[in-house]
């Protein structure tokens, strides 16, 4: 199986890190979740509905849609908060990345553990910029909102390609494909990891600073 890989890059102010990453992760999982499966008998099941809600960001001029699941939201907040703290405490130039990996389990014979086979990985590269004053922060609030909107459109376009998804499992195999631990939604099995890098600034960071400078010059 070939694992698809998608990379998104965002440049934000420190206080925008959490909201920007959550907006991207929630958007991806909105398209990679189903309602709970209700099996009647082997091979026959119904799928519950997935509720959604709009989320307004505090530090970014942006609203996104997420699955209406407090359990899923808590799990994502925990992972992103750990990344944000690690980024802040790293002493580096404020550059890191978060990876969201979707996988399915392949049963192995005893005494070996199950094999986790990734089928899609999303990487969000995050560059933190330092701003001089409140005027620059307000401009960044708007510009980051515009850029996030472009990322969301890109995510939706990728989701609409109808590429590989794990086939719907039988009742006995559902835990090999979906996370069934949540009571109100059923995302594909996933895991989130992060990495802090020591690299110097990227073209995205430079572009954001140029956008702010050009806006101030108007």
From Swiss-Prot:
GO terms for cellular component: phagophore assembly site. The keyword Protein transport does not apply. Transmembrane segments: none annotated. Pfam families: ATG101. Keywords: Autophagy, Cytoplasm. GO terms for biological process: autophagy. It is found in: Cytoplasm; Preautophagosomal structure. InterPro entries: ATG101. Belongs to the ATG101 family. PANTHER family: AUTOPHAGY-RELATED PROTEIN 101 (PTHR13292:SF0). Autophagy factor required for autophagosome formation. This is Autophagy-related protein 101. The lineage of its organism: Eukaryota, Metazoa, Chordata, Craniata, Vertebrata. The gene is atg101.
């Amino acid at each position: 199986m070939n694992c698809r890989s998608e990379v998104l890059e965002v440049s934000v102010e420190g206080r925008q890190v959490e909201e920007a990453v959550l907006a991207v992760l929630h958007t991806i999982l909105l398209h990679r979740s189903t309602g709970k499966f209700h099996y009647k008998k082997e091979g026959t099941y119904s799928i519950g509905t997935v509720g959604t809600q709009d989320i307004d960001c505090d530090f970014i001029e942006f609203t996104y849609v997420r699955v209406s699941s407090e359990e899923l939201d808590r799990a994502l907040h925990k992972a992103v908060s750990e990344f944000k703290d690690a980024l802040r405490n790293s002493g580096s130039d404020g550059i890191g990345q978060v990876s969201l990996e979707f996988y399915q389990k392949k049963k192995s014979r005893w005494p070996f553990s199950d094999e986790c086979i990734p089928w899609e990985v999303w990487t969000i590269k995050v560059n933190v910029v330092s701003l001089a004053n409140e005027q620059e922060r307000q401009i960044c609030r708007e510009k980051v909102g515009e850029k996030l909107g472009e990322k969301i459109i890109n995510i939706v376009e990728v989701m609409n390609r109808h590429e590989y998804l794990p086939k719907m499992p039988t009742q006995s195999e559902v835990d090999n494909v979906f996370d069934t631990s949540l009571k109100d939604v059923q995302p594909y099995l996933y895991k989130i990891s992060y990495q802090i890098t020591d690299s110097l600034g990227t073209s995205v960071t430079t572009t954001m600073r140029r956008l702010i400078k050009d806006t101030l010059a108007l």
